[in-house]
């Protein structure tokens, strides 16, 4: 068949473009089409590493899963990762440079060439490409340097669907205003509008839809109801890391760092009955959890200093002395050591900082970035978390720091190459690792949570059965696709795509 494409652009950030792309990808896949997602430029600290060691935005990984494809860095050729005064630019899956944000325009033409090459390669491998824009497509102050919205639609020669979010209010003004701000040639690309996150009686809303269509002379293809799906996407960051007051039988506190990255590490914990995940950034919020997790961060030293300044650092040390188990992941792992050195200014202007001193490791930042998928085994139980020794785990590493392991550190995780990628202290109260995604290993997470409950005298009435991660995700993608089919004019959408 001839190559087909369609692009979802938004009236603003967080209107649900990623979710709608995911929905359409799964629908088209279920129709037997060879479909793939594409986003020219992503801005996120929530990244992923492909099998060939290339880094890309997490949202396109989700969309690839909906297409039943392995994630491919071609799907997201440019990823911007803000870090303090600088932004790290990932191009074609590898670090391209660290740049001050105001200088980004200087890279525009270079990145545009890379984006076009990536799209051309991807489109040769698939029959249909579903593209996603970034933020608002009508930011007139950024138009000259924009490579991810209408400029990308032109490169792909893709028809555009404009998405707006009614839940935040002002949906009609945002749709009309967005279209009016575009030049005529770009307006002509918009073939339909989708109103997202609707709550209420659709029959009462229909007259307003007709009025809108008369004003813009573009059909509204449907109204998507507000519905929650357990799908990782950039728009869910705020929802996931908000502070929850309710406490289940097992209370896990995750430190909400200013530059926190890879929040998807903890998605599976949110799905386990009687487990409450609380994100905290003040000593008073920490209380007495059953487990403290310090997550990954794009600026380890700065976030460590922030914890010292607001006394959260002291509170964590106090809880450790009373026996509260602590787990650090990536940047959190580095913080648990004795010293962090950044003489090259990889993350910022602070050259060194003392860590918690819980683990006998010293970390030095290098310009070379480690990006790889990793499989390994748990080498020992922890004091509060037993029955995990011997568990097989898999995940991925994204870090500039290299940690030198001292004699007092106890090896906790060894990868299949024989390298130690995590250690614990001699009391086995504190542990850390470079592995993101380790909780997605079903055998490990089941034993981990069950043992943690038992250690805290929480009744475990039956084995903790966690639905296989891939099956769970698959069901959510199908549920999303079904809602999309029920509320969007699929016939008209296919006609726009010439399918």
Swiss-Prot record:
Pathway connected to this protein: Cofactor biosynthesis; adenosylcobalamin biosynthesis
GATase cobBQ-type domain residues: 249-444
Domain of life per record: Bacteria
Endpoints of the signal sequence: none
Catalytic residues in the record: 330 (nucleophile), 436
Pfam families: CbiA, GATase_3
One biological process term in Gene Ontology: cobalamin biosynthetic process
Any one GO molecular-function label of the UniProt entry: ABC-type vitamin B12 transporter activity
Keywords per UniProt: Cobalamin biosynthesis, Glutamine amidotransferase
Record's keyword annotation contains Disulfide bond: no
Family: Belongs to the CobB/CobQ family. CobQ subfamily.
Protein name stated in the entry: Cobyric acid synthase
Organism in which the protein naturally occurs: Clostridium beijerinckii (strain ATCC 51743 / NCIMB 8052) (Clostridium acetobutylicum)
